[in-house]
């Protein structure tokens, strides 16, 4: 875990192939050198990883937005999705920043929640959702799995229910 499997140049080649094919590239970055992911559609660091890549700790919304925009400019990402644990996630590009709160729920185990959120985000984006809709889906997906013990799978029914509840809570 956290070791990365792509040797130098492999990530860049895969990103180029996907971009040439018109496919979005979503990267769950590891390490501090995000140059290896240059040109990806989006990166999905957690708050701590974002701060490490930016060279400083980030806590507030403004600090997270500033750090994300620095990485966008430096590496050509279209946007950054910063996962923020109990604070949800932030979707940031050079013009806009959306902070998406989590829905209150009892947390049993955070194992796999970030991976679930990122996979749900990438799948939603690939299926044609815009980045904010994809983040809303990802946030709901992560919220379901933290309510389970151990690493857990997410069912369509659970995700649909979570989205329905979050939509009605916002209305």
Positions of predicted regions on the chain:
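Short, small-residue alpha-helix embedded
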Residues: 110-131, 135
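Ribokinase/PfkB-type carbohydrate-kinase core domain
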Residues: 1-99, 103-106, 127-129, 137-140, ...
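Hydrophobic transmembrane alpha-helical segments of multi-pass transport and channel proteins
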Residues: 113, 145-146, 150
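N-terminal cofactor/phosphate-binding cores enriched in small/glycine residues
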Residues: 89-91, 119-122, 144
């Amino acid at each position: 875990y956290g070791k990365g499997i792509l040797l130098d140049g492999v990530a860049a080649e895969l990103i180029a192939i996907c971009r040439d094919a018109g496919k979005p590239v979503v990267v769950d970055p590891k390490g501090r050198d995000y140059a290896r992911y240059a040109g990806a559609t989006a990166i999905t660091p957690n708050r701590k990883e974002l701060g490490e890549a930016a060279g400083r700790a980030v806590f507030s919304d403004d600090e997270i937005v500033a750090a994300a925009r620095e990485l966008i400019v430096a590496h050509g990402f279209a946007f950054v999705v910063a996962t923020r644990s109990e604070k949800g996630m932030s979707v940031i590009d050079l013009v806009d920043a959306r902070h998406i709160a989590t829905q209150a729920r009892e947390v049993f185990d955070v194992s796999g929640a970030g991976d679930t959120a990122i996979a749900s985000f990438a799948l939603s984006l690939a299926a044609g959702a815009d980045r904010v809709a994809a983040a809303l889906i990802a946030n709901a997906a992560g919220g379901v799995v933290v309510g389970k013990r151990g690493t857990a799978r997410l069912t369509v029914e659970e995700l649909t229910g979570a989205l329905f509840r979050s939509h009605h809570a916002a209305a």
